[in-house]
Amino acid sequence: MIDKRDDKPFKLKSKYKPSGDQPQAIESLVDNIEGGEKAQILLGATGTGKTYTMSQVISKVNKPTLVIAHNKTLAGQLYGEFKEFFPDNAVEYFVSYYDYYQPEAYVPSSDTYIEKDSSVNDEIDKLRHSATASLLERNDVIVVASVSCIYGLGSPKEYADSAVSLRPGQEISRDTLLNQLVDIQFERNDIDFQRGCFRVRGDVVEVFPASRDEHAFRVEFFGDEIDRICEIESLTGKTIGEVDHLVLFPATHFVTNDEHMEQSIAKIQAELAEQLQLFESEGKLLEAQRLRQRTEYDIEMLREMGYTSGVENYSRHMDGRSPGEPPYTLLDFFPEDFLIMIDESHMTMGQIKGMYNGDQARKQMLVDYGFRLPSALDNRPLRREEFESHVHQIVYVSATPGEYEMSQTNTIIEQIIRPTGLLDPEIDVRPSMGQMDDLLGEINQRVARDERTFITTLTKKMAEDLTDYLKEMGVKVKYMHSDIKTLERTEIIRDLRLGVFDVLIGINLLREGIDVPEVSLVAILDADKEGFLRNERGLIQTIGRAARNVDGHVIMYADKMTDSMQRAIDETARRREIQIAYNKAHGIVPQTIKKDIRGLISISKTSHNDISKEEMDYESMSRGERKEAINALQKQMQEAAELLDFELAAQMRDLILELKLMD
């Protein structure tokens, strides 16, 4: 069993003090948590500092906390913010470690088997190991995760029990330590010393934990006793300092001992025999042969190496679970009394609900056609009700909480006041007849004031037609459609802020990262067409895009007033009234948010120009120029990964592959 370090309280460091209605929200949330309330909602309007409020709550209740976001980008932003707020505590990041992932699948209609194809991001793998190690070693831990945290991870008990604990003066031979390291999936590599490896130099063993980046450990022996343990720089070998206790966790989350492995293999073989009998009785000889060949190969690898590609598909047998029993996940690494915060809960809870069904449909096809044993179905994400069973206390955070969250609790804490004094925008409803000319007039007013405009439409055709019309009228406009990738999207937002163009048109402008303080007008076309983007929640989210500018204004073009429109307008008016009263009582003058315009990471050729597929004619390049471009792209890919922009890193990787294929 791992001895946890002495309890260390969360220590929040910030130049800000709670303001507006943050103090009331923080106090209510903390009182409810300490009073044993299971679920509550923080209903925070856009730009009110919800992350800061979450940080204050964490520091006051002092519990290990899991923060779940609905995508990697948002998780990365939150991770960065929490790291700044809690520099002395363990703030960890846990998302899917794939830069690119094509799951194993089979398409019967075309008899196409798609092999699992993936590219693992080494940095994220390190961060995942760091998260699980921190959870087992200490209590002052915040883990920011995507919904990957509800996917199977391996048994925390096996993971903890397999850990190697070392102290100076401990009696253990060098060879015994080497065998223990191999058992927990460390590799000996005396030349290329990297994460998950160890090297041996006489009576000195150097180990590079899977959870570390630049620092490794040197274990010095005197006979069959540990003489000294030092932390070292992995690159130079320079000693940083001595340590009195070192815990080495396994280099993979799926780990088991020899005895347990043989038991697991016996179960796999029994299931294989049963499934082969079923296939043969149904005359499915091809499926039977395929399953026998694949499974026997995996068994051989497990026996010889203790690991095989796709080992997670046998996790039910490895963990000793019954059929249908939920897998171990990151949630099982937390102690019983921990806090969960769901960011943008109206999106995230929907994802948690939907993960299971999509996973099962794909895997069932693999089982039916002999690519996997039925137990592979139990390597899966949690069902929503299984996730709920892990919840001790939970806070749903959203500007527009969903029906699910509202059904879980009646405790709703509002955070409506913005520290900047900014108000929710005023809203006009205008008829759709003559909307083009009316909109053009409004845009021209904004252009004259050096302000920007968002226009949201319901269809691609409408967006394209409107873009063409505004261009003919001399307006600098761009249309952001679903085919635009992360890098281009970032460039478009930057160019809008810089004034390269004045109007951005899109179908769904609710995605994170679209908060642009320069936008003073949001126009919603077809506002009376009920649906996902025109329901109350969608409208409030869209209205919030104009809440970053002191002159923020929203125009809804509609021929009738729908219930969703009325509720969104009423809710915005209610919030605006509260904000005006607060500003008046405290003498606050609203100010537009000041937000730096961040430059993009540049990919240099020699002139440091951005390289993109559209701008560079790769086919006309010489082999040397292509090699130079590949080197530049690889550097950019690493920089993007370090900045946690993994979508951009994946695009860079795809571009590199295309260039390599040209040679």
Curated annotation (Swiss-Prot):
Residues 435-601 form the Helicase C-terminal domain. The keyword RNA-binding does not apply. Coiled coil: none annotated. Keywords: ATP-binding, Cytoplasm, DNA damage, DNA excision, DNA repair, Excision nuclease, Helicase, Hydrolase, Nucleotide-binding, SOS response. One of its GO terms (molecular function) is ATP hydrolysis activity. Residues 627-662 form the UVR domain. InterPro entries: Helicase/UvrB_N, Helicase_ATP-bd, Helicase_C-like, P-loop_NTPase, UVR_dom, UVR_dom_sf, UvrB, UvrB_inter. A motif (Beta-hairpin) lies at residues 97-120. Pfam families: Helicase_C (PF00271), ResIII (PF04851), UVR (PF02151), UvrB (PF12344), UvrB_inter (PF17757). CDD domains: DEXHc_UvrB, SF2_C_UvrB. It comes from the Bacteria. One of its GO terms (cellular component) is excinuclease repair complex. GO terms for biological process: nucleotide-excision repair; SOS response. It is found in: Cytoplasm. Residues 31-271 form the Helicase ATP-binding domain. Residues 1-10 have a biased composition (Basic and acidic residues). Residues 1-23 are annotated as: Disordered. Belongs to the UvrB family. PANTHER family: UVRABC SYSTEM PROTEIN B (PTHR24029:SF0). Forms a heterotetramer with UvrA during the search for lesions. Interacts with UvrC in an incision complex. The beta-hairpin motif is involved in DNA binding. The UvrABC repair system catalyzes the recognition and processing of DNA lesions. A damage recognition complex composed of 2 UvrA and 2 UvrB subunits scans DNA for abnormalities. Upon binding of the UvrA(2)B(2) complex to a putative damaged site, the DNA wraps around one UvrB monomer. DNA wrap is dependent on ATP binding by UvrB and probably causes local melting of the DNA helix, facilitating insertion of UvrB beta-hairpin between the DNA strands. Then UvrB probes one DNA strand for the presence of a lesion. This is UvrABC system protein B. It comes from Streptococcus pyogenes serotype M2 (strain MGAS10270). The gene is uvrB.
